[in-house]
């Protein structure tokens, strides 16, 4: 089936650091600076040791998936647990359905320090750190065990380490499911069926190159515009995981789903 040609979609949560600029090319100082992650850990540890987390803290988390999507529900659970384990000090408001901004904008805002948290696809992170794009390549992992071994190991650590140069801290990788094709009129039964079809993709080199290699016309489009794009015929189909296909209502206008 076509699913063997596709990658597993992985997503990563981010949080802004202290507002410092990206690392430059000047020589390092005599006393090495602590990393953003170390600063966060040291501050949290000191507060926990004193038993006083201070005044209430309020943060915003951007999520492009709709309410009811397991990813969105996971972000809400993250917010609930953060509030619980800090005795009500940390309050994170989750904004689903791209209510604050799209994924690309959320990354820019986290880097600028104007947004606190964002849950984004690794494909969307590729323009900032190339290694994230590699995680979305087809056939990269032979099985789920190999995937998590890489992401929880050196590869994932390298990617998160690079984020610190852009004023961000990676929290964790999050499973979103395998990506599949779905179309409005012509069903896809083999790779040849993709020839000439306009398929919505994310605005990333990996996604565009993959769809073009399969013979289709890659059409970058913001996630929030996909439903209308399918409905009006701007695109013939799209590629995403099944849960997003369902919770975003894309099944209403794209009846053909190829696993």
Residue ranges and their predicted role:
Residues 1-58:
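Short, low-complexity disordered leader/linker segments with a strong preference
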Residues 18-23, 40, 48-145, 163-259:
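N-terminal secretory/targeting leader peptides
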Residues 145-160:
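A gly/proline- and charged-residue-enriched helix-loop-helix capping module
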